[in-house]
A protein has these predicted regions:
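Carbohydrate-binding surfaces of carbohydrate-active enzymes
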Residues: 32-39, 72, 84, 93, ...
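Polysaccharide-binding and catalytic clefts of secreted carbohydrate-active enzymes
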Residues: 1-109, 113-127
Length: 252
């Protein structure tokens, strides 16, 4: 599949050699079949560093494009049955493997999962919120996931202190979130995320501090009505966040 992607991008093996400058260190390719995915047994000399940055950079592009093609195929299948469906998928902030800016055009609305660690710098979440909002030129986004209590993959699976979930939720709204949603509604009895937080814990009822906090937040957001939904704020400053540059810099 990588070779097919390269043929579409470069047309001929001669053009690929020219643009990759494969003459350096005698790395010229004479047939498409000679090209393999970069790894420690081919181009890499460290996990993320490459002898031939162009190959590694193109492989990262190919990986992102392949995942995007899979998403687009699934979106087409949904639209064939539900033409007016609003289609999105969970982004994960500044997630390195996928070029979210390229993906954005294929999503009806941007949505992402926010899971800051206990005591994490609030600026990191703020940057990720702004990154998500910028993907569709300022269009408000959806906070698709956050935990109301614990986060199962952290070293310390701590319960959020009183008020922290509310604080993080309003931070998202202030940065342009039109929804505040949770994963998960009811905690799983087994499986990978059985220790991940939920609105309804293993206790199985709503008489818990976490449930009451979620309930109170819902009432507060309902009281706001449409005052903030769809709101836009003219930006006075901007940051350029580019996946191609990120990839190229780190594999050099």
């Amino acid at each position: 599949a990588f070779r097919v992607w390269l043929k579409k991008r470069y047309g001929t093996i001669e053009n690929l050699n020219r643009l990759w400058n494969t003459r350096f260190w005698g790395h010229t390719f004479y047939d498409w079949d000679e090209i393999v995915a970069p790894s420690m047994v081919s181009e890499h000399f460290e996990e993320a560093r490459s002898m031939y940055q162009a190959i590694t950079l193109d492989y990262k592009r190919f990986n992102s494009d392949s995942m995007l093609a899979n998403y687009q195929a699934e979106a087409e299948a949904i639209r064939a049955q539900i033409p007016d469906a609003l289609i999105t998928t969970n982004f994960m902030g500044a997630y390195k493997p996928l070029d979210y800016k390229k993906w954005a055009a294929s999503l009806d609305v941007i949505s992402w999962d926010n899971y800051p660690a206990e005591g994490a710098d609030s600026a990191a979440a703020a940057m990720n919120h702004d990154l998500m909002r910028g993907l569709k030129n300022g269009q408000p986004f959806l906070l698709m996931e956050q935990t109301p209590s614990t986060c199962n993959w952290l070293n310390d699976n701590r319960l959020k202190r009183p008020g922290v979930m509310r604080l993080l939720s309003y931070q998202a709204v202030a940065h342009g979130a039109d929804t505040v949603m949770f994963f998960q509604m009811r905690r799983s009895r087994a499986g990978c995320e059985k220790f991940h937080g939920a609105v309804i814990d293993h206790a199985g009822h709503g008489n818990t501090r976490v449930f009451r906090e979620c309930q109170a937040l819902g009432m507060e957001l309902k009281a706001l009505g449409k005052a903030v939904v769809g709101a836009r704020v003219p930006a006075k400053a901007a940051l350029i966040f580019d996946w191609d540059t990120w990839w190229a810099l780190e594999c050099s």
